[in-house]
Every structure is written in C-alpha cells, then in structure tokens.
Amino acid sequence: SCASNRPNRVHKQVMTQRTQVTLTFDQHEYKTNCMLKVWKNELIVLSVMPVMGIELFRLEATPDQVTIIDKLNRRYTIMTYEEINKLSPRRISYKMLQLLINKAEKEINFDLQAGTHTLQLKANMGQREYNNQKEPQMVNTNKYKQVSLREILPI
C-alpha cells in the first residue's frame, strides 16, 4: 500500500495561543501581536509579528538555553539560564516559564530587573488550541550573525 512507503513522522501535541504583548523597557512601551507555541518539556516559541503576520522577532526557549532572533536585522543571541539569572535577582528556568504559561488563563505579568533597567512584560492570552504537529522547527541560525544580548536589548 501507499502508506507503507511514507516515512514515519513523529507527531507531538503542541499548544498554540495568540497573544497581545505589551513590553515596557525603561519607560518605553511597545505593543505587538505574538504567537506562542509550546511543545511540552522541549521548546517554547514566542513569535513577534507586529505587522500583517510577518515574524520580526522570535524567542526560542529550550530546557538548556534561550535564543533571541532579530529577523529584521538578521542577528541572534543565545543565553543559558545561568547567564540570564546573572542579570536579574529573579530566577528563571525552562520549567518556570512552562509553568507560568500553563497556569495563565487570561494574562501573564512578568517583571525583570537587569542592573538599572526594568523590563515588564504583560501578555493578554487568547484562546488555546492543542494540535498534533511534527517535531518543532527551530530557526536555522546559520543565516544570522551571532551578537551579544546588549546589541539586541540595550541592557
């Protein structure tokens, strides 16, 4: 039969949720539409799409690290949770992020102090959808230049 000729694809359940995010960084406020996807215990993706569904920024969190991709300027930065936790007294881990998302029904509020800078994130959560999808696709960073976090976020 035809079905026997197809390669086996592993499908996993992914939670998808549209969100409206307000990011306040040192008194400057930015509002944007985002798409949040969570593959349990594997990957959290936050796609920032402010205009017509075009992804300009992307945050990919795995259990080991966080990658911030600036697609507009073709650059990215990678940080371990240990490096992130050196910037702020608030401890952050993959499990904590996943728990925060799972428990949030309508809204997520998150404040982060990095030196003299304050970053506040407020996300209005839309309807959650659960679907089976193939393995998560991470951005191929070979197309981008690796830079420091300070080049992407001036902290």
Q: Predicted regions span which residues?
A:
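Charged, gly/pro-rich active-site loop segments
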Residues: 91-114
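Start-of-domain marker
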Residues: 3-64
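Non-transmembrane domains of secretory- and envelope-associated proteins
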Residues: 72, 108-155
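An acidic-aromatic
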Residues: 43-95
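Generic "edge-of-domain/loop-turn" microfeature
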Residues: 26-28, 43, 53, 66, ...
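Detector for Asparagine
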Residues: 5-8, 33, 41, 73, ...
